[in-house]
Amino acid sequence: MTLYDENNLHIIKDNLRYLKLLSKQYPSISSASSEIINLQAILNLPKGTEHFISDVHGEYESFTHMLKNASGVIKRKIDDVFGTSLRECDKKNLATLIYYPEQKLDLIKKSEKNLEDWYKITLYRLIRLCQIVSSKYTRSKVRKSLPSDFAYIIEELLNEQGDRVDKQEYYNSIIETIIDIDRASEFIIAISNVIQRLVVDKLHIIGDIYDRGPGAEIIIEALSKHHSIDIQWGNHDIVWMGAAAGCEACIANVIRISLRYANLSTLEDGYGINLLPLATFAMDFYKEDNCENFKPRTIDKNLNETDIKLLSKMHKAISIIQFKLEGKIIKRRPEFKMEERLLLDKINIKEGTLNLNEKIYKLIDTNFPTLDKENPYELNERERDLVEKLTNSFINSEKLQRHIKFLYSNGSLYLKYNSNLLYHGCIPLNDDGSLKEVTLCKETLKGKSLLDKLDRLAREAYFFKKDPESKLYGMDMMWYLWCGPNSPLFGKKKMTTFERYFLDDKNTHKEEKNPYYKYRNNEKMCTMIFEEFELDADNSHIINGHIPVKTKEGENPIKANGKLLVIDGGFCKAYQPQTGIAGYTLIYNSYGLLLTSHEPFSSIHKAIVEGNDILSSTTILEHVSSRKRVLDTDSGEEIKKQIHDLEMLLVAYRKGLIKEENEANIRF
């Protein structure tokens, strides 16, 4: 070895304790050398494909399909492999089979006249496609992706060339045997799932899994089974995380939003949250109130008048409770500087008015049966009892707690990954574009240090159960992250929920965005953020969600000359009339960056029966002349460190600083 000679042998001696531990795993020169060769080979493989999705908002059907088709990657692979040798309808059917193998096979078995021939043709096609998508990985990594039932057979087929004369008979006999013993369906399902798994090496979810859609819990259940995933929390995720931690204000917000969009399936069916106490409370206190301004906003939901009336009453009841609970946090935490959101004490019930910023506004709803004008932020006895019951439901929901732990273990406020900076909302800025300083826990923080601190506090809210004071502060901070003026997730000066319910004047409904959004198209701002997060400004991108891109109005998701990319997924149906599309996703493969825009998705049923896919158009943002390799990634940096350590171990063996283990002992 030339890396370590007599002049720098002290480096090895300084690391001798660690190297002795490493020698337990690689007990000989032979085993250490083999591992170096293996790792060096991995460095030269093409970089794995990354898939970026944002702002799912509980729309599980669209998301499930996007996950299965990898934003069009599978279709592009089919085109690459089969080109003009397959008709478009055959390509479409093959793609649908890979996305939904079980359901598609059920249909094919009913319609296909010569099923054995179809099996044979399809198996050849799937194996060929799988050979291509697995070619950028080591055999070891591919092997780990294979289902145990078919692992050996799939590995044999992937590594044999069916066009070689001496192997063709062997290759054909395997496929014929699979069909003869009636295992073709199971094999097709298995290899389709392998293709889905291998086509994307890393999945990034840039926030807002939760919100108004009906299936957030279905989405998280699917994500928890994904082989490699990270999540950057969104504002809607953080409010659910706060609710699961026991933050009463977050619980009230979660329930209010669910009632606002008549989406109770996630709460009741998904997580078993009992809303009957709230319904009883609402009927008792708002029986004669039509709660006109609290009628749920329904899209594609057929609700009868009785349901609408009940949901409206529940909606108003929890909203008033929310304002009371939020008032307590604001008073408890003067450092949040949110006193202007204390509005209940500004209500004149007798006059039916609100004093907002020294201006008097007429209230459009003056029925406040639970409001004590002397102590407007105090819960009455019935409200306190209700809040305790709801909190117990959230804390004791096994599935909710499991899902939130998954968000904590796989998530963070931001992520640096392969020279890209991923975050959901914004980096708080001043009006002049400089980083905004925020004081928390007697510390003045900005930029990266602010996000790091907020990330730690969010974890304390959930995990510091034996430290009530720290846990309470963390829970209050979770609520602040949801709606606070300097929250990197919210990104606005204030949340005007009260004004939207109780005031007609639309000017009071406005929510001023953080200056970050004014500077998003500014390359200097992006460079400043890259420097703050210790990234190379020439080779990095900010990948952002949160604010839907209004493509319909000509807005471009590519900001600051390609340095900042906004990929709000547009899954939320309510935003699609404004955006004109169903949003964007991003693919980062060994050839570069691909931004894909998507049309609205019809349904999984139509995708299976009619072969309907999400219509997408792809823009090549960056294309490299030589493919990026594992060498160029964060994983590559880690592998280089491993190689460095193993090289030190080799020198330690050769210099006699560590003794090799006897070959016989190694084997037996």
From Swiss-Prot:
- Could you list this entry's UniProt keywords, alphabetically sorted: Carbohydrate metabolism, Hydrolase, Manganese
Name of the protein in its database record: Fructose-1,6-bisphosphatase class 3
Q: Which InterPro entries match?
A: FBPtase_class3, Metallo-depent_PP-like
UniProt lists the gene as fbp
> Cofactor(s) for this protein?
Mn(2+)
Q: What family, per the record?
A: Belongs to the FBPase class 3 family.
Enzyme Commission no: 3.1.3.11
- Catalysed reactions, as listed in the record: beta-D-fructose 1,6-bisphosphate + H2O = beta-D-fructose 6-phosphate + phosphate
Q: In which pathway does it act?
A: Carbohydrate biosynthesis; gluconeogenesis
**A GO MF term:** fructose 1,6-bisphosphate 1-phosphatase activity
Q: What is the organism field in this record?
A: Clostridium botulinum (strain 657 / Type Ba4)
Q: What HAMAP family does the annotation carry?
A: FBPase_class3
Q: Does the keyword RNA-binding apply?
A: no
Q: Name one GO biological process term.
A: gluconeogenesis
Mind giving the lineage of the organism this protein is from?
Bacteria, Bacillati, Bacillota, Clostridia, Eubacteriales
